[in-house]
Design a protein with these regions (language model features):
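Substrate-binding cleft/loops of secretory-pathway carbohydrate-active enzymes
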Residues: 136, 214-252
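Boundary/entry segment of secreted carbohydrate-active catalytic domains
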Residues: 1-15, 219
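Substrate-binding cleft of secreted/luminal carbohydrate-active enzymes
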Residues: 244-255, 271-336
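Aromatic-lined carbohydrate-recognition surfaces of secreted/lumenal glycan-active proteins
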Residues: 127, 173, 188-228, 273-283
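Catalytic domains of carbohydrate-active enzymes, especially glycoside hydrolases
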Residues: 11-38, 120-121, 239-241, 297, ...
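Aromatic- and acidic-residue-enriched segments that line the glycan-binding/catalytic groove
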Residues: 62-90, 131-178
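Active-site-adjacent "subsite" loops/lids of carbohydrate-active enzymes
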Residues: 54-118
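The substrate-binding groove and active-site-proximal loops of carbohydrate-active enzymes
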Residues: 5, 26-33, 92-108, 186-196, ...
Length: 426
């Protein structure tokens, strides 16, 4: 019911990690190790502490065998709308080396890799990650790091244009999506690429289930967000458990993002899939606010990235008390956690008090920096007036009477949830 993700490397003190997990009430770990043999070493250690192990495996993006496949199969790599292949192009970071899901040889390669891990005795399941395309849109808080604004889909980050993908689409629909003025507006083309990723996920599920193991995944926050951002329509995947990465610090920075996403996930997930909620570790009270937001909105468990982020003895002790209490509630309720928030995701940014407080704090910081002062000044804001709306973007203009500053405030809605915001002075 309480899980974590963790990288495993030979020589690490894995026993002490498992002891900490057991002490604070965690019962499962999605472990990323270089080889199947590493799991054969790690699993007995985890089981000694009552910890269940899933193999946390990258699929469409290469990890441990990246250089080998680049050298041997450069034609396997994903291509963007500009015709650039990841075999010789970088998208954001050097380790983004995604394969094309339409290629039969890529699917065969992934299937054989999954089999090699499924053959590990004692491994309970497979949790796939990076089963998607390159981010056509990054989470909003990452934009400044790359010096970009992704208010719509741009060609350089729009992947899935490998010749095999284009030919497969054309044979089904009779046209090349590149012939359109703006291919990003073609819903059939977007969904087709999502479906190629879904076919890979369900191929993997078939392999995993043939070994009698649990099929899990760590996708983007919701199926609708993931479809837009990374072509990952995971509500159609044959998963036993899903651990969506609802990392609020990457998006709105407010805990309400977790509630909104979880409500959407209850609605849009595969009916046969048990919904958990993945979140970043916080060594403080916000950790428990985040877990409450997920469990009160319909999640049946929690995954924390990662247990190493829970450092203080105070938080560890409180985490143990929390996990014990949640298990007691679940046991008393027939093995499920009932949602207590019977609402839909709120797409009105102005009713999200936490988000608007962050927006205004950003405004105050802008005014303070412009005046050369450290103290954040009070605001006297006028009425927000919408100036523009396109794709997933809504723009507003608002003036502060105190500083005579006019702000442009932008909200982003990828999927059916408020997924990001920005503030600049005009």
């Amino acid at each position: 019911m309480f899980w974590t993700w963790l990288d495993y490397r030979p020589g690490m003190n894995f026993d002490s990690v498992c002891q900490v997990m057991n002490d604070i009430g965690m019962d499962g770990i999605m472990l990323n190790a270089p080889t199947p043999d590493d799991y054969r070493i790690a699993i007995p250690i985890a089981r000694k502490h009552g910890i269940e192990v899933y193999a946390w495996l990258w699929t469409m993006n290469l990890e441990h065998d990246r250089d080998k496949i680049l050298a041997e199969h450069p034609d396997w790599f994903s291509v963007n709308r500009n015709g650039k292949s990841l075999a010789d192009t970088t998208a954001y970071v050097d380790y983004y080396k995604f394969l094309c899901p339409a290629l039969p040889e890529v699917r065969e390669f992934i299937g054989e890799k999954i089999k090699s891990y499924c053959e590990v005795e004692g491994l309970s399941g497979i949790a796939i990650d990076y089963n998607r395309l390159v981010d056509v849109v990054l989470p909003t808080t990452l934009w400044p790091h790359y010096g970009i604004v992704q208010d719509r889909e741009y060609a350089a980050w729009d992947y899935g244009y490998h010749p095999a993908m284009l030919e497969k689409f054309k044979s089904r629909y009779g046209y090349d999506p590149r012939e359109q003025q703006d291919p990003s507006t073609d819903i059939k083309w977007r969904q087709f690429r999502c479906d190629q990723i879904t076919e890979v996920a369900n191929m993997i599920a078939g392999v995993v289930h043939s070994y009698g193991k649990t099929m899990a995944a760590s996708p983007f926050p919701t199926p609708k967000m993931a479809s837009r951002m990374v072509r990952q329509d995971w509500g159609k995947w044959n998963l036993d458990i899903v651990f969506p990465m609802v990392y609020h610090t990457f998006y709105t920075e407010d805990v309400s993002f977790i509630s909104d996403c979880t409500v959407e996930n209850v609605r849009d997930k595969n009916d046969k899939t048990v919904l958990y909620c993945g979140m970043t570790a916080t060594d403080g009270p916000e950790m428990f606010e985040c877990m409450d937001a997920a469990l009160n909105s319909g999640a049946q468990g929690i995954a924390v990235f990662t247990v190493a982020g829970l450092r203080s003895s105070e938080v560890k002790n409180r985490f143990k008390t929390y996990t014990d209490s949640v298990r007691a509630v679940r046991a008393a309720n027939g093995g499920i956690i009932e949602a207590v928030h019977p609402y839909v995701a709120d797409t009105n940014p102005f009713t999200h008090k936490g988000i608007m407080a962050l927006v205004e704090k950003r405004m105050r910081r802008i005014v303070a920096e412009a005046s050369g002062k450290e103290e954040l000044p009070p605001l006297a804001l006028g009425e927000y007036k919408q100036t523009e709306s396109y794709d997933a973007t809504r723009c507003y203009r608002v003036a502060d009477e105190n500083s005579r500053t006019v702000f442009k405030v932008t909200f982003y809605f990828y999927g059916d949830v408020l997924s990001g915001w920005d503030v600049v002075a005009e």
